């Protein structure tokens, strides 16, 4: 089973860029592995580092700013996760330490992949995201409270409502990925298989 997500309080980092694609999130040269770990080191590699080997941090990239070290909530702009389909993108984000991405919109495939990997994509309106960017930039180091059960983000003195469909919310709150969902029906699967002719087993 995956880790349950019910509530999360975390440091927020503002990535003020629209149409951040999956190749920017995790460049293609790092996709050889099929395990989910180790990708965080290469998250936003071409933006975070000045060299190809990832040894010289770019001091002008927001994830490298001292006040945002340890951030677990990413604040982004519209169409986050667009581009080619690669599940490595949410792998890289979660391996780096992100639990939540807040944006006005997400690419459809990235949105679905995020739930499969216990990364919560929160959609808020453009105006609400503008407010949050202003709040974070005025208060570096601010933390947000994200409550999946209540479907709320508490930021400063305001509360922002978001909506996640009931099935995805149930899965995240119970730590159920595709394997976990299947195992919930293990007895029924075993009973079905037992009824099959021997040559089909």
Swiss-Prot record:
NCBIfam families with a match to the protein in the record: leuD (TIGR00171), PRK01641.1 (NF002458)
UniProt similarity note: Belongs to the LeuD family. LeuD type 1 subfamily.
Annotated protein name in UniProt: 3-isopropylmalate dehydratase small subunit
Protein's job: Catalyzes the isomerization between 2-isopropylmalate and 3-isopropylmalate, via the formation of 2-isopropylmaleate.
Documented EC number(s): 4.2.1.33
GO cellular component: 3-isopropylmalate dehydratase complex
Pathway connected to this protein: Amino-acid biosynthesis; L-leucine biosynthesis; L-leucine from 3-methyl-2-oxobutanoate: step 2/4
Record keyword Lyase present: yes
GO biological process: L-leucine biosynthetic process
Top-level enzyme category: lyase
Catalytic activity line of the entry: (2R,3S)-3-isopropylmalate = (2S)-2-isopropylmalate
The UniProt record lists the keyword Nucleotide-binding: no
Lineage: Bacteria, Pseudomonadati, Pseudomonadota, Gammaproteobacteria, Enterobacterales
Cleavable signal peptide: none
Self-association and partners: Heterodimer of LeuC and LeuD.
